[in-house]
Amino acid sequence: MQTVTMYTGPFCPYCAMAKRLLHAAGVGHIDEIRVDASPEAFAEMQQLSGQRSVPQIFIGETHVGGFTDLYRLQQEGGLDGLLNP
C-alpha cells in the first residue's frame, strides 16, 4: 500500500472526514503534517500542492487534492488503484 500523507489543521471537519474515508478504504496509517504548528510545513504544502487550504492529501507521490477530490476519486472507483498500484 502506498504511503498516505495529509496536511491538516486544527478543528478541520474536512480533515476528519478525509481520515475516516481513508481508514474505511483500508489505510492503517496516515502521515499527518499539521500546518498550523509549523510555517515551514505550510510553505512545503503550498509548494507541493499549489494550494493554501487543508486538507491536502498525497498518496505516494500523487497529489490527490482536498477532501472533495478524495471523495470523488473514491466514488469513481480510482482510490483503491491509487492506494494499491
Swiss-Prot record:
User: What are the alphabetically sorted keywords of the record?
Assistant: Cytoplasm, Disulfide bond, Electron transport, Redox-active center, Transport
Q: Name one GO molecular function term.
A: electron transfer activity
* Cysteine-cysteine disulfides: C12-C15
What does the entry give for GO biological process? cell redox homeostasis
GO CC terms of this entry: cytoplasm
Annotated localization: Cytoplasm
Q: Name one Pfam family in it.
A: Glutaredoxin
Q: Where is the Glutaredoxin domain?
A: 1-85
NCBIfam families (alphabetical): GRX_bact
Q: Which family does it belong to?
A: Belongs to the glutaredoxin family.
Function comment? Has a glutathione-disulfide oxidoreductase activity in the presence of NADPH and glutathione reductase. Reduces low molecular weight disulfides and proteins.
Subunit structure, per the record?
A: Monomer.
Please give the name of this protein. Glutaredoxin
Species source reads Neisseria meningitidis serogroup B (strain ATCC BAA-335 / MC58)
